[in-house]
Amino acid sequence: MVNVPKTRKTYCKGKTCRKHTQHKVTQYKAGKASLFAQGKRRYDRKQSGFGGQTKPVFHKKAKTTKKVVLRLECVKCKTRAQLTLKRCKHFELGGEKKQKGQALQF
């Protein structure tokens, strides 16, 4: 279980800051894939008509988790940076700190 606080003081690369400032932490989420990207247009054109599936469908999935990516936004200059964490099954943002001698809760 990885628990990350919602704010963190870290270095800001922004042109106005260039020093350690407070950052707001959120979890990165991939955007919606565009229908007009060249590869998608080509794939849709190839798929249309008769002939079934034209490209291999991936089945050999090996990983059980994804790496967690944090999005750090500077409170002062709004510059955003991304930070990759290690793989984990349970990720929590801004959860309660755990006390000594207590059982884990999911």
Swiss-Prot record:
SUPFAM superfamilies: Zn-binding ribosomal proteins. It is found in: Cytoplasm. One of its GO terms (biological process) is cytoplasmic translation. The modification N6-methyllysine is found at residues 40, 55. GO terms for molecular function: structural constituent of ribosome. It comes from the Eukaryota. The keyword Ribonucleoprotein applies. It holds the Pfam family Ribosomal_L44. One of its GO terms (cellular component) is cytosolic large ribosomal subunit. In wild-type cells, 78% of L42 is monomethylated at both Lys-40 and Lys-55, and 22% are a mixture of species with either residue monomethylated. Its main location: cytoplasm. Keywords: Antibiotic resistance, Cycloheximide resistance, Cytoplasm, Methylation, Ribonucleoprotein, Ribosomal protein. PROSITE patterns: RIBOSOMAL_L44E. Component of the ribosome, a large ribonucleoprotein complex responsible for the synthesis of proteins in the cell. The small ribosomal subunit (SSU) binds messenger RNAs (mRNAs) and translates the encoded message by selecting cognate aminoacyl-transfer RNA (tRNA) molecules. The large subunit (LSU) contains the ribosomal catalytic site termed the peptidyl transferase center (PTC), which catalyzes the formation of peptide bonds, thereby polymerizing the amino acids delivered by tRNAs into a polypeptide chain. Present with 13600 molecules/cell in log phase SD medium. There are 2 genes for eL42 in yeast. Component of the large ribosomal subunit (LSU). Mature yeast ribosomes consist of a small (40S) and a large (60S) subunit. The 40S small subunit contains 1 molecule of ribosomal RNA (18S rRNA) and 33 different proteins (encoded by 57 genes). The large 60S subunit contains 3 rRNA molecules (25S, 5.8S and 5S rRNA) and 46 different proteins (encoded by 81 genes). Belongs to the eukaryotic ribosomal protein eL42 family. This is Large ribosomal subunit protein eL42A. It comes from Saccharomyces cerevisiae (strain ATCC 204508 / S288c).
